[in-house]
């Protein structure tokens, strides 16, 4: 069995099991966190949402909001996690179709069945284990999933080809696959928002981008990000989630929490934006 070993344990999050459990608990209880492990449902069913992927000491409290919200909708069979490929390693759109991912909290198995169905609907996605070797955008979601939901499967996908058309095609393919799969699944778009600008500028730019997401306007998101130089590293995965949501009828989108690294670190001269956003119907 192919096992993807942790690449950023001890860097983005604690490398010891007990320390990591304590770190996630800290994120939940943080003044910027949700305070509770389960939030009341906002609607009948949830598709998933957007979550940040920075170091837990910076973005963990914001990420916890999405997982606490999803916990209110119940445990799924699988998480489809779509993240950016920061390093440009491997295929333009890469999926891991079999094997497992390891974290300090144990192993999670890749859902081969769902991965195969997604691939059948989008021929450009390639089974490429190497593409995930250094990438943290999927990895940092996995301990949160393990903490909140225990033993569930995942389908990891990363993309360095983050065009609007690729995002739409992959999103529609995931939607079709979930219809065929027939079991409970959540889709996570792993993304941070604006990068390395003062807190006030990052906040303003993020709010412009988030307004497009709340309207399910993926084209508008790409347009405004280009026009105002909003450096969203996972704009493609967010586009994937929006396209899937529209295809499946998840037309309600709620911003759960928005903050910057300045809010958690206190250093506001050069910040990164984070948001947890829930998609439901």
Swiss-Prot record:
Superkingdom per UniProt: Archaea
InterPro entries reported in the protein's UniProt record: MEMO1_fam
Q: Which Gene3D superfamilies match?
A: LigB-like
Family membership = Belongs to the MEMO1 family.
Which PANTHER family does the record match to this protein? PROTEIN MEMO1
Which HAMAP family does the protein's record reference? MEMO1
Q: What is this protein called?
A: MEMO1 family protein PAE0818
Phylogenetic classification of the source organism: Archaea, Thermoproteota, Thermoprotei, Thermoproteales, Thermoproteaceae
């Amino acid at each position: 069995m192919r096992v993807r070993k942790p690449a950023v344990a001890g860097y983005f999050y604690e490398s010891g099991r007990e320390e990591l459990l304590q770190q996630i608990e800290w994120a939940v209880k943080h003044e910027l966190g949700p305070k509770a492990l389960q939030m009341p449902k906002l609607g009948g069913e949830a598709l998933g949402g957007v979550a940040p992927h920075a170091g837990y000491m910076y973005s963990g409290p914001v990420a916890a909001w999405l997982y606490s919200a999803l916990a209110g909708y119940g445990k799924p069979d699988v998480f489809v996690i779509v993240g950016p490929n920061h390093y440009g390693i491997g295929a333009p759109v890469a999926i891991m179709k079999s094997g497992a991912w390891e974290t300090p909290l144990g192993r999670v198995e890749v859902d081969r069945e769902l991965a195969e169905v997604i691939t059948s609907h989008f021929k450009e996605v390639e089974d490429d284990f190497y593409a995930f070797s250094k990438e943290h955008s999927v990895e940092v979601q996995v301990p949160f999933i393990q903490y909140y939901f225990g033993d569930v499967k995942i389908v990891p996908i990363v993309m360095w080809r983050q065009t609007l058309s690729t995002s739409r095609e992959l999103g529609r393919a995931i939607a079709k696959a979930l219809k065929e799969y027939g079991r409970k699944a959540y889709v996570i778009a792993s993304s941070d928002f604006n990068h390395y600008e003062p807190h006030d500028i990052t906040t303003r730019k993020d709010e412009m981008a988030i307004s497009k997401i709340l309207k399910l306007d993926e084209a508008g998101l790409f347009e405004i990000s280009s026009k105002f130089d909003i450096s969203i590293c996972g704009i493609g995965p967010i586009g994937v989630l929006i396209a899937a949501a529209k295809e499946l009828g998840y037309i309600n989108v709620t911003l759960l929490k928005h903050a910057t690294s300045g809010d958690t670190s206190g250093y506001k001269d050069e910040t990164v934006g984070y948001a947890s956003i829930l998609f439901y119907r």
